[in-house]
């Protein structure tokens, strides 16, 4: 392979694959090697689905050779947070030692949507155990240990989608899928210097994913660019009768330009507590967005937002995880 695919974004990889300049099999082998050799040093990988990935890559390659191109993710490997059911192809641990060897008899809807798009499942990625439901403040509360930041291994990768952020940031997968209840996509994306998209509630099916909070859980992508995240979201946001909260309208990626007159609200003093570098990045991003949007600074009503969300989260997570606390499974967790 004459092209080094590491740190090429999804859009570029897809273009090379479609043009038959890049082999899905060779691409997948490259990332499988990185997952096996580099992933452990970041504690970001729980299971490398080697045989499955090679099988899916070979199928994708043959389809593309035959002119059966499925779309922009066809032939591209990815990793997924280890709370999505992946059938018997790989254990689904929820990041917790008591479930180290557990498999399910079904696949999560997002896994099936990506399979149907021709994307290649290469790894199950690390996470805070039980998605943080048993102790978000302990980075070591993860099956693989504290997930390390690709920019500085002495720092944490964020959570609870720790492995998803770290794996994309360290170039061991081109993109990943995470979940967010209260910051679990945006936090690791921010910590690891990559793009994360936390969709509107109900945009992506949660069927086959661990439940932490029925009212707050969301599924979304982590990738190298915002454009990539939009492409991935378009693929995974499909109506699903297995999740009654999912929108019946499929998401369609729209490219905005100055002619669209988009309005963008920015919350006043929203980054007042951020450090200088973060503030600079924030305002630089706003200056770019000003080329396609009218930006208006707004103030939100003075409500106790944190207390409201915490009340919902604590009550729903206590209910969702009740069986595991009652039967003693929780005693096997790292966070206490």
Outline where the language-model segments fall.
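An N-terminal boundary/leader segment
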Residues: 1-55, 291
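Short, well-ordered beta-strand elements within core beta-sheets of diverse protein domains
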Residues: 13-19, 79, 98-103, 217-224
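Acyltransferase
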Residues: 21-29, 58, 276-299, 321-334
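Flexible, acidic loop-helix segments that line cofactor/substrate-binding pockets
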Residues: 43, 247-250, 261-263, 267-268, ...
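Acidic/His- and Gly-rich active-site-bordering loop/insert found
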Residues: 53, 63-140
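Short helix-loop capping/hinge segments that flank enzyme active sites or metal/cofactor-binding pockets
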Residues: 73-94, 258-267, 311-336
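Short glycine/serine-rich loop segments
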Residues: 106-236
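A short helix-breaking turn/cap at a secondary-structure junction
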Residues: 198-283, 327
């Amino acid at each position: 392979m004459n092209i080094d695919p590491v740190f090429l974004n999804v859009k570029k990889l897809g273009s090379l694959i479609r043009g038959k300049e890049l082999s899905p099999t060779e691409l997948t082998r490259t990332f499988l090697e990185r997952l096996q050799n580099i992933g452990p040093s970041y504690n970001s990988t729980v299971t490398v689905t080697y045989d499955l990935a090679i099988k899916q890559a070979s199928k994708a390659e043959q389809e593309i050779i035959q002119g059966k191109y499925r779309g922009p993710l066809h032939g591209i490997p990815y990793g997924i947070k280890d709370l999505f059911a992946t059938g018997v192809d790989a254990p689904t641990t929820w990041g917790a030692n008591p479930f180290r060897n557990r498999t399910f008899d079904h696949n999560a809807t997002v896994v099936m949507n990506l399979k149907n798009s021709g994307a290649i499942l290469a790894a199950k990625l690390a996470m805070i155990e039980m998605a943080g439901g048993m102790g978000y403040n302990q980075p070591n509360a993860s099956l693989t240990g504290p997930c390390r930041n690709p920019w500085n291994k002495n720092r944490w990768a964020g959570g609870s989608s720790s492995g998803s952020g770290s794996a994309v940031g360290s170039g061991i997968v081109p993109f990943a899928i995470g979940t967010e209840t209260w910051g679990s996509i945006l936090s690791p994306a921010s910590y690891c210097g990559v793009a994360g998209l936390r969709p509107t509630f109900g945009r992506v099916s949660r069927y086959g994913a661990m439940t932490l909070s029925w009212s707050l859980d969301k599924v979304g992508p982590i990738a190298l660019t915002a454009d990539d995240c939009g492409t991935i979201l378009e693929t995974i946001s499909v109506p699903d009768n297995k999740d009654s909260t999912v929108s019946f309208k499929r998401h369609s990626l729209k490219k905005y330009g100055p002619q669209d007159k988009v309005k963008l609200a920015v919350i006043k003093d929203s980054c007042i507590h951020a450090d200088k570098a973060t503030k600079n990045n924030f305002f630089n991003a706003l200056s770019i967005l000003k080329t396609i949007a009218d930006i208006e600074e707004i103030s939100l009503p003075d409500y106790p937002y944190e207390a409201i969300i915490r009340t919902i989260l604590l009550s729903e997570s206590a209910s969702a995880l009740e069986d595991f606390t009652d039967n003693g499974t929780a005693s096997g967790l790292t966070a206490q």
